[in-house]
Each structure stands twice: as C-alpha cells, then as structure tokens.
C-alpha cells in the first residue's frame, strides 16, 4: 500500500478538537498533542506511523486505532450498507503541530 493513501481526512469533531487543544495547553513537563484522522481500512499502526513520518516529517509517539462498522440503512426500500471505516488517534510529544490544509 502506498503511504500517501493511508491518511484520508482529519476527523473534525468537538472531541477531536479538544484533544488537540488540551495537549497543547498542558502545564506539565511534556506536552502531548493528539490528532484524529480517518485512515484506510487496511492500514495498521506501523503503516500509519510511517505515513506521518513521510508526509508530515514528524514522528508519532503512539497510535491508537478504532474500527467502525458501517450501518445498514434503507434506500428506496432496499437495504444499503454504509462502508466500514477506521479512525486513528495519533499522539505526538513536545507539542508537534501539523497543518492538514498545507499538506493537502
């Protein structure tokens, strides 16, 4: 799998925005910033870490992954499944910042 295809989009929710700002504003010795992104379904933690190293030139300290199963919805009285998707929460130490709009 190409590393450019691993990271799809940033997840913009209230909780993901709180994870970014809480880590950046911490008063402890190490500042940990967490970014939430939507990744390819077949990507694993090591591929996600390598993709961040290559694309954004920063090394993540940890990667947490969650898989979401697509729900079955109805369209014109027929069941139509939504696709499965995967979310990754990537943690950086020392307040590393990423600009997703610049790298797109």
Curated annotation (Swiss-Prot):
One example GO MF annotation: structural constituent of ribosome
Asked if the record carries the keyword Transmembrane, the reply is: no
The record's keywords, sorted A to Z, are: Ribonucleoprotein, Ribosomal protein, RNA-binding, rRNA-binding
- Name a biological process GO annotation: translation
Q: Name one GO cellular component term.
A: ribosome
Name the domain of life: Bacteria
Q: Which Pfam families does the annotation name? A: Ribosomal_L23
Q: Does RNA-binding show up as a keyword for this record?
A: yes
Record InterPro entries: Nucleotide-bd_a/b_plait_sf, Ribosomal_uL23-like, Ribosomal_uL23/eL15/eS24_sf
The UniProt subunit note reads as follows:
Part of the 50S ribosomal subunit. Contacts protein L29, and trigger factor when it is bound to the ribosome.
Q: Which family does the similarity line name? A: Belongs to the universal ribosomal protein uL23 family.
Q: Its function?
A: One of the early assembly proteins it binds 23S rRNA. One of the proteins that surrounds the polypeptide exit tunnel on the outside of the ribosome. Forms the main docking site for trigger factor binding to the ribosome.
Q: What is this protein called?
A: Large ribosomal subunit protein uL23
Q: Which organism is it from?
A: Leptospira borgpetersenii serovar Hardjo-bovis (strain JB197)
């Amino acid at each position: 799998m190409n590393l450019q295809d691993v990271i799809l989009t940033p997840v913009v929710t209230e909780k993901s925005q709180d994870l970014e700002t809480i880590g950046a504003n911490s008063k402890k010795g190490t500042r940990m910033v967490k970014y939430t992104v939507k990744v390819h379904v077949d990507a694993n933690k090591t591929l996600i870490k390598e993709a961040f190293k290559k694309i954004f030139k920063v090394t993540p300290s940890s990667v947490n992954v969650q898989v979401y199963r697509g729900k079955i919805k109805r369209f014109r009285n027929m069941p139509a499944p939504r696709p499965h998707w995967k979310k990754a929460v990537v943690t950086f130490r020392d307040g590393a910042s990423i600009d997703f709009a610049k790298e797109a």
